[in-house]
Amino acid sequence: MAELRLEHIYKYYDQKEAAVDDFNLHIKDKEFIVFVGPSGCGKSTTLRMVAGLEDITKGDFYIGDTRVNDIAPKDRDIAMVFQNYALYPHMTVYDNIAFGLKLRKMPKPEIKKRVEEAAKMLGLTEYLHRKPKALSGGQRQRVALGRAIVRDAKVFLMDEPLSNLDAKLRVQMRAEIIKLHQRLQTTTIYVTHDQTEALTMATRIVVMKNGKIQQIGTPKDVYEHPENVFVGGFIGSPAMNFFKGKLTDGAIQIGSAALSVPEGKMKMLREKGYAGKDVIFGIRPEDIHDELIVVESYKNSSITAKINVAELLGSEIMVYSRIGDQDFIARIDARHDIHAGEELTVAFDMNKAHFFDSETEIRIRS
C-alpha cells in the first residue's frame, strides 16, 4: 500500500503550452482517486507520468517517501490496466495473468497460487485455459484486472478501462471494480471521461480541464458545491442549467422573470458586492420542480414556460424549455401527461441555487 504525492507537476511537449500545468495532489493510502475531464485535458498524460511511461518535465512525484521521477516503470511497484486490455492473443487466460510474474522469475508454485486466487476473485476459474478470442469484452477486462492483481503492487492505475464495453457491461464492471477495491484496499488512480463513473466509484474526484485541476473533492462535494461553471456543467447528467441574470433587490432577474433569492444567499451576495450586478445563476434539473410539488416557499420562484421537448424516461420526464432566450432542462415526475407545445408551471428551489462571477465563472461563496 502507498501514499502518492504529486508536487507542482508540469508536462510540456513543446515550450508553448503545458499539457499538464502545476498539478498538485496528495493521494492517501487505500484511496480510489478518479481523474475526470474531457478529451485532451491531461488526465491520461498525468497517469502515464505516474506510471513512468512519460517523463515529468518539471516537479516531483513521490511514492511514500521515495522520489520516483527517475525510477524505471518496472521498479515503481505499479500495475496498470489499459483501455484495450493489452492481452496476448496466442496465450491462455492463465498465461496472460501469469505473464508478469514469469518475467520476474517467480517460483511456479507461487505463480499458480496467485493466478488461481485472482481467477477465483474475478470469476475466471473456468476460463483459465481459454484464449482471449473466446472471451466476451467483460471477461477480457477481468483478465486485464487479474494481471494487475497478481502483481500485488502498491498502486493500481486504470486508464479508461471500461470505455470499450457496452452500457450494460460498464455498469456491471463498475460494481466489480468497486468491490475489488473494497477487498484489496490498494491505492488506485482511475482515469475516465465519464462523470457517472467518477461519481459512483471515487473516494475523491480530480476534475481537469486544459491540463489544470479545476476541483478536488468527494463526489458529493464536487456535485453539490462546484468550484466553477465548468465543473457544474461537466459533473452531473443532465448538466447543470446556467442563466445570465442580474441581481436586483432580493431576486435574480432573468429576462422578464424574477426569481426570489433566499435572504441568507442574498445577504452573502450583497456582502461580496454583487448587488445590482450581472452574475451566472446555476441550478440542477432535479431542483426545478413541477406544479404538483410546488410548496409555499417556491411561490416566488415559479414561472410558466412553454415545453419545447418532453422526453419520457420511465419514472421521470426531461422537459426542455426556456426563459427568454436561455434554454433549461427540468427533471420532473412522470405523473404528468405533458407534450411539446404545452405550457407547464415550474418552480426553482432557490435554496439549491448556485451563483458564479460573470467574468471569472468562479463560484461566489461566503
Question: Residue spans of the language-model regions?
Answer:
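ABC ATPase nucleotide-binding domain
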Residues: 5, 26, 62, 246, ...
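The feature captures the beta-strand-to-loop junction immediately N-terminal to the Walker
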Residues: 36-38
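ABC ATPase nucleotide-binding domains
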Residues: 71-230
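Glycine/charge-rich catalytic "coupling/switch" loops of P-loop NTPases
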Residues: 249-307, 337-366
